Structure formats: structure tokens, C-alpha cells
Amino acid sequence: MFLAVLYCLLWSFQISDGHFPRACASSKNLLAKECCPPWMGDGSPCGQLSGRGSCQDILLSSAPSGPQFPFKGVDDRESWPSVFYNRTCQCSGNFMGFNCGNCKFGFGGPNCTEKRVLIRRNIFDLSVSEKNKFFSYLTLAKHTISSVYVIPTGTYGQMNNGSTPMFNDINIYDLFVWMHYYVSRDTLLGGSEIWRDIDFAHEAPGFLPWHRLFLLLWEQEIRELTGDENFTVPYWDWRDAENCDICTDEYLGGRHPENPNLLSPASFFSSWQIICSRSEEYNSHQVLCDGTPEGPLLRNPGNHDKAKTPRLPSSADVEFCLSLTQYESGSMDRTANFSFRNTLEGFASPLTGIADPSQSSMHNALHIFMNGTMSQVQGSANDPIFLLHHAFVDSIFEQWLRRHRPLLEVYPEANAPIGHNRDSYMVPFIPLYRNGDFFITSKDLGYDYSYLQESDPGFYRNYIEPYLEQASRIWPWLLGAALVGAVIAAALSGLSSRLCLQKKKKKKQPQEERQPLLMDKDDYHSLLYQSHL
């Protein structure tokens, strides 16, 4: 019955976020460099007739990039998305999307006016049914072809500058795998030449905002695919872990009994095929990953190079990261010292904050530890552990934002590695998002973490302090009222005692003594409320 429902769902939903909109993948759109599809609600481009948005020229930042990429005009991702499009939808108010058909993160309802905050939870706190539902959603996404998005299989030059489009269909899960590959791939310089020192989502300031957006879009896709408006990705809290405690068949897949590099046949994910894992092959042929299946998921946790990654991160490591006051420093790349971003990403020591090329720690340590598909940057998103891992990394980013409350100006405006400046549009997303747009608290983006709710100092500051301040202003009146109340209570008590004595004298047989119910339901709630304050 479950499989029947799953496969009925398989073909019945359409989704609306990813990379290249199918509606903008024609030679007409590429030659015109315009991506302003109609909103199906009124049929007008960008929903303009309904006031949702309009087709506008893209305004690119003129801030200079760092010296890490010494070329210009050789990579389609430069000045994203200007190689492909120079006009896209600019949405109004709380509307969002490549055709302004969606709501901004944190808003819902037909007119995007309903504010919402959803909670990401620890995967070990999910019930069996919740956990299995999450896995079924992953499976559904893996088997559902996107009706809205396609992926390019060639560079703009290989497409004859747009006159011969080269695009493939792709399933929803692999769409995000492909995006992670595309943003981190090497630059193809022609012939056999490549440039490796480039990455639009790693080793620089945009690492945390980019992956934050990636997860938000992924959640949005799953909600639209399944109709589950409350879906959030769970996180894996790996602090102080001695092994991969989610690498069991009950969760993300145990070890194969005969081949330790494969997943157990009993795992949800043992039959999954991966894509975009052969970077050297693509480089040698000067081609892009085209989404062709390349074999099963590989994972052999713990059998990695322990000289480079001696252990998984500890609570103390996380706390040290959070204590760093600078988001970014120096050259703003993998050599940055005392940088929160570089330390959390794993290129600087979580003991000293000094960049150490001989070690991989924090975020990087988990990738290395998995010793398989997840250990190669471009193809790492094939493994569903990637989602849970990055959800927890994002929660650490969120803790840092709440603790230090940085202004937007803290995020570098210029001279960061290419694609990582504050106002740079993030590759390869359409609609367009800037790095700085996600340098804000998660609550402003419509989500929170279950373990941060209890310890959020903002709760005390925003909700408890005002009541205490109000109480301090009226305490003299409260004291006076209490004294008057005590006098009245004493008088009533005396009168009650006299009446009771008179009644006892009249009765010949003694009455059974009863203990009052001090913890009646309403009394208990009142006591809890006062004790919590």
C-alpha cells in the first residue's frame, strides 16, 4: 500500500525552485538573455498584472574580487548570471521565485502575508513514523523528474552562445546534487587546461550563506512535492560523537556485510545511484556533469586518514568557534586566521584559530570521516547525510549570529574570492539571491532549531524582561495590597475558626479528617508559571 501511494505521488506533483527554469532554456531566451516567465495565476511575466513583480535589468555589483582567480571572461559563473541572462523577474513585497510565484522564506498564504517559523529537529528526536516519512520524501524526490527545472550539459560557448541549447531533465534530489557540483567545479580553460583554485560556495565568506540558501530551497522543494507545509530537514548533532551513530539501517544506512565501502542492502539508500562524482574525467574532456548515473553510494565511515582528521569535532571545538568574534579575516580564503567561517569550515584549528593545511577539522572532518562519496566536494551532496550534517553546521552559524549580532557590514563587501562578496549573486540560483541576504538570523528566514529555542537569550530579553520591569515599577502597590490582603485573611481566618469550634461543639460524633488537594490542575499550572518566572 505504501509503495502504491508513493508511486501515485511520484507523478502528481510539480515543483518550482532550482537552477535553470525550463521556461528559460530555449534558444530564444538564451539569445535574448531574458528569463521572465509568466506567473500561471494571471499569465503575465513575473505576475506583473497582479503586482507580484516585473521584468528588470540585473544590476551587478562592481566591487572587486580577490586575487585568487586571475582570469576574466573564461567561466560562465563569473558575474552570475550575466553570461546567460541580463534580465530576470524582480519580485515585490513578500513574493519570490523565478516568476514571482512563491513566497519569501518565512511567509505563506495566497498573498504571502502569513508569517511562519518552522522548527528543524534532531533526527534522534523524530518518531519512527516521522523518520520513515522523511526517508520516503527523499525517495520520492529521487524518483521525481522536475517539470520546472533542467540542467545545462555544456558551457555557454559549447551551446554556440545560446543558439544550440544543451539541457537535460533531472530528478529533484539530483538537481540539488548537480547544483553543489556546479558551484564548486573547476574552471575549464580549453584544451587540457583547468583552474582549480575557484569555488563559489566554499573556502570563502559565502560558505555559510550559500549552504543556508541551499537547505532552504531544498526544504521548499520537498514541501511543494509532498504538500507537507510543515516539513523541515532534521539535523545530526555530531558533537563528541565517537563514530557515525546515524550510519545504521534504521537511519541513513549501515555497512554492507561483504563490502565495507557499500551500504547495507537493508538500507533505504542502498539502491541509489550517484551523479557528478568524476571530476577528473569531466576536466580531461572539458565537459560538464550531465546527470548520468555513475554507480552506488560509497561510504566507509571511520576508515579514513586519521593523521589528517584524528577525531570528530567536540563540544569544546564548537564553543571555541563560537567565541571567535571575526566572521572573516585576512585574505578571506582557506588561509584566514581567527576567522569564524574558516574555523567552522575546517581549514583552521578549533584549538587556536590558526589555518592549518595539514589538518581537516569541524565541517570538513565529517566529510573526511565518511570516507566515500561524501568526501569529494563536488559530489558530496549525493549522500543524504550531507543534508543533516549541513543543517547542524547552519545551526552553529545561527548560534554565532545570535551571540555576536553582527551588522550586515561585517560581511565583506569587496576583495573576497570571486563570487563571495556581499552583493554577489550566488551561483547557480535563479531566482537571484545575494550572499548578504542570508547573513541574518534564521527566524527572519522562517525557521529555528529545537535545541536553540530553549537556550535563546533573546527569549528572556524579549519576553521576560518587560514583565519584570513592569513589576518593579508597581512593587510598592503590590506590597501594600499584600499587607491589606494579609490583614483581611487573618480576620477571616479568626472568624472561620470560631464558627468551626461552634459546629464541633454541636456535633456528637467526630468527622473524618481530609487532606486538601494542593496540586489540583489549576493550582499546579499556577505554581509552575510562578516557578518558571
UniProtKB/Swiss-Prot annotation:
Glycan attachment positions: 86, 111, 161, 230, 337, 371
Subcellular location, record wording: Melanosome membrane; Melanosome
Gene3D superfamilies from the UniProt entry: Di-copper center containing domain from catechol oxidase
Any one Gene Ontology molecular-function term assigned to this protein's record: identical protein binding
Role noted for this protein: This is a copper-containing oxidase that functions in the formation of pigments such as melanins and other polyphenolic compounds. Catalyzes the initial and rate limiting step in the cascade of reactions leading to melanin production from tyrosine. In addition to hydroxylating tyrosine to DOPA (3,4-dihydroxyphenylalanine), also catalyzes the oxidation of DOPA to DOPA-quinone, and possibly the oxidation of DHI (5,6-dihydroxyindole) to indole-5,6 quinone.
Protein name (Swiss-Prot/TrEMBL): Tyrosinase
Cofactor annotation remark: Binds 2 copper ions per subunit.
Amino-acid positions noted as binding Cu cation B in the UniProt annotation, renumbered to this chain: 363, 367, 390
Gene designation: Tyr
PANTHER family reported in the protein's UniProt record: TYROSINASE, TYROSINASE FAMILY MEMBER
TM region positions: 477-497
